[in-house]
UniProtKB/Swiss-Prot annotation:
Its cofactor is FAD. Residues 1-32 form the signal peptide. The gene is yetM. FAD binds at residues 12, 31-32, 126, 285. This is Putative FAD-dependent monooxygenase YetM.
């Protein structure tokens, strides 16, 4: 095996490209978008994510362009502190958490991928593939064909590679909540060393520092599977939700329509079948997209990427390598996914025990991957 083809240029796909290239493989990455992402909210990088970022070689860049916090503080709607927990659960030598804009993280990964020699193809959406005993050929939307030894689908929750491999359309499970997210600029020195969460009933609002004067806000509220919030109503809807939280006055008065509000429904995909067939493998959200409750989506995708490269390097036979990858990754990723969705379910129904599940997840994450 010499040449690897990756579908998807998000966090998982770029991480896989870097890992495989460092392992000595020739790598081509196909991304459907015509250029690297220019928008997006923030992303939280807990300690296990920082550990894999270090292994990937991008830890220093992420910390340089991110904002580190040590505490997670939870408040009621009046702004009264309910409790705080340390974000350090794995390694005292690492920051508790690094928060970074998704666009910035993509830029960092793109820079490192290009530096190690990944061939990046923009505007190339993989829509099908054909296999022989010797190779796999991906068909792009524009008609171009690309041949490789392995095709890795890191093409997200709506993965074409996954659905072609499984020969069915994978159903997305609605988790009962919608999420609104937006970037915000605030006065200097607003933030120090903590991420904030505000709760009232079934509404949760997170305020995540990206700098001492800037951050991103996410709002979680119940919604039906057929609900959608149009772009032109999102700003006013979010402002109305925040107005019920006196403790969030410092956010509400600085909201600006210059920064668009992103909306999506919380959905998950849990692939119960093997993640590989023949010369095709999936990873990241294509295999285990889940709730953002524990901020583990990106971390799990990067772990997938590193393990895939290790197993392909360790085994000359592709079937043995892909099976070893699946056996290492599926139990851990699906366990974290299940815990994340169960936390959403309990909070949605007002049931106790969500905090205990967070501790259970941390215990899983302390184990090697």
């Amino acid at each position: 095996m010499k040449h690897m083809l990756i579908a998807g240029g998000g966090i998982g796909g770029l991480s896989a490209a870097i890992s495989l290239r460092k392992a000595g493989f020739s790598v081509t990455l196909c991304e459907a978008a015509s250029e690297n992402r220019k928008t997006g909210a923030g992303i939280l990088q807990p300690q296990n994510a920082l550990a894999v970022l270090k292994e990937l070689g991008v830890f220093e860049d992420c910390c340089k362009h991110g904002f580190q916090t040590e505490w997670f503080k939870t408040f009621d709607e009046q702004g009264n502190l309910l409790f705080q927990v340390s974000e350090s659960f794995l390694d005292d030598s690492l920051p508790g958490r690094n928060n970074i804009l998704r666009k910035t993280l993509n830029d960092i990964l793109m820079k490192h991928a290009e530096a190690v020699g990944v061939d990046i193809k923009w505007g190339k959406k993989v829509v099908a593939y054909e296999e022989t005993a010797e190779s796999v050929t991906a068909l792009c939307e524009d008609g171009e064909k690309m041949q490789a030894d392995i095709l890795a689908g890191f093409d997200g929750i709506h993965s074409v590679v996954r659905d072609k491999m499984l020969q069915k359309e994978t159903e997305k499970e609605h988790l009962g909540m919608g999420a609104w997210r937006f970037y915000i600029e605030l006065p200097d020195y607003t933030f120090e060393d903590a991420t904030f969460m505000y709760r009232s009933g079934d509404t949760q609002i997170g305020v995540v520092p990206l700098a001492q004067h800037a951050g991103y806000v996410f709002v979680l509220q119940p919604c039906t599977s057929d609900y959608w919030d149009e772009e032109d109503t999102r700003f006013d809807r979010v402002k109305e939700i925040l107005s019920g939280f006196r403790g969030l006055d410092f956010v509400t008065k600085h909201m600006s329509k210059q920064h668009p509000v992103i909306f999506n429904k919380l959905e998950q995909v849990a692939v119960q079948e093997p993640w590989h067939k023949g010369r095709v493998i999936i990873g990241g959200d294509a295999a285990h997209a889940g709730a953002p409750t524990l901020a583990q989506g990106a971390a799990m995708a990067i772990e997938d990427a590193i393990v895939l490269a290790e197993e392909l390097q360790n085994h000359a036979d592709h079937e043995t390598a892909l099976q070893a990858y699946y056996k290492r990754r599926a139990p851990r990723a699906l366990k974290v996914q299940n815990l994340s969705s169960e936390i959403v379910r309990r909070r949605l129904k007002g049931e106790p025990g969500a905090e205990e599940l967070i501790g259970e997840c941390y215990a899983v994450l302390r184990e090697g991957y």
